[in-house]
């Protein structure tokens, strides 16, 4: 019931994805061979079919599709700790690589492989009793995750128009750049995500580094540490689908509560408690502490500061044994104390949900998803970098050589700029704006 089909694409997506499966397997007591050996069968198995398909002999197989345009990352997943748990047919890869080129992923190399991926997606979807939606892990800076990822999203959109499409998208970082053409790839991807995705959880390596460095006190964070943070959040977002809870939410409820205008579906995510590995057993958590940490700007996993904008909506998902009353009080408290950071024309704009089962090794945890206008900082930054290069037509021949047209770049650029100004418009909007317009008009007539 209510299955979610997981797709991971490109190097980044596959690394995040495989970490996510480790976390989910751990929570459901599934060992690396796919057998159940947990300690509380009724809870762990009750809704295990959200993410797993039960195969013959009681093995649980992830509903995951893994795609890439080169075999490297897939090979390392296959030889990794949980490599044997995936269905072998669900690895779909090419040999050529996309070479950080969005056009290769979207139009040439990726387009050749996409039908093979869609076949696997169809096969998995047919195995579902009542498919709720898709979750896609990818980065927007490279070629495969961004180009082929968005191609797959638009194809799935065509075929399953009424299913939720949730993405975990790693944006290029402000200071740490992996490739020069990141702004191009990211802008072209956002152009697609605005139209074809329902909910985008925005992640960013630099913000994740900061969390690892500042809060978790890791001196040299590895991508493994970063991906661990992401997977904790991913697990939190879907926990109320997978475990019984007092206040449940699913992907659609999340969307209905978080998206006031269809294009503004890019969310900041946060997670609490963030503790360094050694000090986990020393913290006693209370709901107020969780709430405080969860709303902390330093906890946001993308490089935008929520204090520079206002929240249109937000959602807080708590896990563990706690009273719903206390959760409600804390959420209300946050809204009352920081009312200037919430738009006043959406009253009670924070949704909370409570799930009884905490993550492994912690008593309580919470996941935060917020729709804040300050995320425009991120789009604005990428857009400026895009414009700087596009004005000089730098690196453009790599894209036009794959058959792209400059027009598409111009469209993507203006779509991104529209998005920024939409966020700005709602940030400045007030509840009694209509009256102001009337007054202005009257003055015009008088003069």
Swiss-Prot record:
GTP binds at residues 11, 70, 139, 143-145, 205, 227. GO terms for molecular function: GTP binding; GTPase activity; metal ion binding; mRNA binding; structural constituent of cytoskeleton. It is found in: Cytoplasm, Cytoskeleton. SUPFAM superfamilies: Tubulin C-terminal domain-like, Tubulin nucleotide-binding domain-like. Residues 420-447 are annotated as: Disordered. Gene3D superfamilies: Helix hairpin bin, Tubulin/FtsZ, C-terminal domain, Tubulin/FtsZ, GTPase domain. Residues 430-447 have a biased composition (Acidic residues). The keyword Nucleotide-binding applies. The keyword Magnesium applies. GO terms for cellular component: microtubule; vacuole. Its cofactor is Mg(2+). One of its GO terms (biological process) is response to light stimulus. Keywords: Cytoplasm, Cytoskeleton, GTP-binding, Magnesium, Metal-binding, Microtubule, Nucleotide-binding. Its main location: cytoplasm. InterPro entries: Beta-tubulin_BS, Beta_tubulin, Tub_FtsZ_C, Tubulin, Tubulin/FtsZ-like_C, Tubulin/FtsZ_2-layer-sand-dom, Tubulin/FtsZ_GTPase_sf, Tubulin_C. Signal peptide: none annotated. Tubulin is the major constituent of microtubules, a cylinder consisting of laterally associated linear protofilaments composed of alpha- and beta-tubulin heterodimers. Microtubules grow by the addition of GTP-tubulin dimers to the microtubule end, where a stabilizing cap forms. Below the cap, tubulin dimers are in GDP-bound state, owing to GTPase activity of alpha-tubulin. Belongs to the tubulin family. Dimer of alpha and beta chains. A typical microtubule is a hollow water-filled tube with an outer diameter of 25 nm and an inner diameter of 15 nM. Alpha-beta heterodimers associate head-to-tail to form protofilaments running lengthwise along the microtubule wall with the beta-tubulin subunit facing the microtubule plus end conferring a structural polarity. Microtubules usually have 13 protofilaments but different protofilament numbers can be found in some organisms and specialized cells. PANTHER family: TUBULIN. There are nine genes coding for beta-tubulin. This is Tubulin beta-1 chain. It comes from Arabidopsis thaliana.
